[in-house]
Structures are given as C-alpha cells and as structure tokens.
Design a protein with these regions (language model features):
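N-terminal beta1-alpha1 cap of cysteine-dependent amidohydrolase-like domains
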Residues: 1-100, 110-112, 118, 122-150, ...
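Conserved G/P- and acidic residue-centered "switch" motifs that form tight phosphate/ATP-binding loops
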Residues: 103
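Hydrophobic, aromatic-enriched interface-forming segments
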Residues: 106-108
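Active-site-proximal beta-strand elements of phosphoester/diester hydrolases
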Residues: 202-205
C-alpha cells in the first residue's frame, strides 16, 4: 500500500515529524507506506503507484478558481499548489482512489466540484463561534453536528463530536456531487462526502491530525487506511489477473 500526502512545502520538509504523517502511523500505517508530495513532484508523480490521497491544510485556494477576485489582504494563495492538487484530485477521482481532505483540502475539493468559499469568515459572515482558535492546536473548541446518518462520518462518530478550529475560510456554495455530513453550531459546513457512489471521499474542516491522541479522531485515519488497503488489494488482484493472462 502507498498513500500520497499532498502537503505544503514546509510541511513536506518535516518528513516523519509532520502531524499528518504521525497521525497515519498512529492509526496503523507504516512510514514506508506514506509519501509526502508537493508541486515540484508533478513531473514524476505516478498515481498508478498509490492507493489513496490525503489533501492537507495550508494556503488559501485562489478565488479565481471559483470565479471571484481576491477581496482581502489575509487571503494567501499558492497558485502552483492549487493547480497541482486539482490535477491530482482529478486523476485520483478517475482512478476511484480513497480521498481524505483536511481544512484547505476540504475547501479545494469543494472548489474543484464547482463550489465556492467564504474568503474570510470575519468579513463575509457574522460567525457565532471562534473558528480560528488562539489556543493550542491540540485543544477542541466547539462541537460539530452530524447531519447524515448514512455517511461514513456518522459511522465513525456518534451524533456529534468536538473539534479544533483553525480556519478563516469555509464552504459557501456546496460543490456538485458533494453532500454535507456535518456542520458547526453556527451553521458552517464542517464536513462533506461524495453524494454518489464512490469508494471513499471524506473531507473535514477541522484538523484531526492535531487531535490524533483522541480515539474518535484517530478513527478517521483508521477508516481512510482501511479503504486504502482495500484499494491496494484490488490493484494487486488486477495485477495478478494481468500476469495470468
């Protein structure tokens, strides 16, 4: 099994010290099964070698991708990463690979599916909760309510869960082919999944990798790994059939 971790350059430089890396290892992955990737890898990246993709947090998605101009000074974009990840997502979807999105990853997935974002929550809305917490990243600050009992998220949690909150943007208009599976108490989208038949596409607005010591948050990564191992088994089966032929 091999999983691509699409991260910011500074996160990639952390290697095995990255919280994403550590969370997946804690959930049962081996370090050899994980490969951090970023835009400079685009020329040689072969998705045939992977069984799942995690889209991590980081910079804001360029508003041009959802038909808007940048309106606020605190919107910090990385166009190269946007282009790289949208192509990576497109190819992963074509191959029906398991996909996990976290924070920016959730927003990027929504935009790729035709949705839009609040460019800055404090400017575009009047949130009742603090969505960019000042405390430790490993602290939970508010609850999210699960909205779809048939979702993978609902099968992982029971009714609601407490999360950290480290974002100044959020989903505004939902992308086509996605469904909301959780929202915050003030109505913001906190999680989405594929609305149609797809092996596994889950994206959450919070940062579960910073909460991986909590059993319920670790289950998100365990579920993702399970789906990746299933994809790996299918790939091995196809390879075996090809050799027999």
């Amino acid at each position: 099994m091999k999983i691509a971790l699409s991260v910011a350059e500074k996160e990639k430089a952390k290697g095995a010290d990255s919280p994403y890396f550590k969370a997946l290892v804690a959930a049962g992955a081996s370090s050899e099964e994980l490969e951090p990737v970023s835009p400079p890898d685009s020329r040689h990246l072969r998705l045939d070698d992977f069984d799942g993709v995690l889209f991590a947090g980081g910079e804001d998605v360029d508003p041009a991708f959802y038909g808007e101009e940048k309106r606020y000074d605190n919107v910090n974009v990385n166009r190269a990463r946007d282009e790289f990840e949208m192509l990576l997502l497109e190819r992963a979807l074509d191959r029906r690979l398991p996909i996990l999105g976290i924070c920016r990853g959730t927003q990027m997935i929504n935009v790729k599916f035709g949705g839009t974002l609040y460019q800055d929550l404090a400017s575009d809305t009047t949130p009742e909760l603090e969505h960019k917490q000042r405390g430790s990243r490993s602290e939970t600050t508010h609850a999210v309510t699960l909205t779809d009992p048939d979702s993978d998220l609902a099968k992982t949690f029971q009714g609601s869960c407490r999360v950290n909150s480290l974002h100044h943007q959020a989903i505004k208009r939902l992308g086509h082919g996605l469904k909301v599976t959780a929202h915050s108490e003030d109505g913001l989208v906190e999680a989405v999944e594929a609305a149609e038949d797809y092996p596994f596409l889950m994206a959450v607005q919070w940062h579960p990798e910073e909460l991986a010591d909590l059993p319920e948050q670790r289950k998100l990564f365990e579920k993702f790994l399970l789906k990746c191992r299933e994809a790996s088994s299918r790939r091995a089966g196809r390879a075996g059939q090809g050799q027999k032929a």
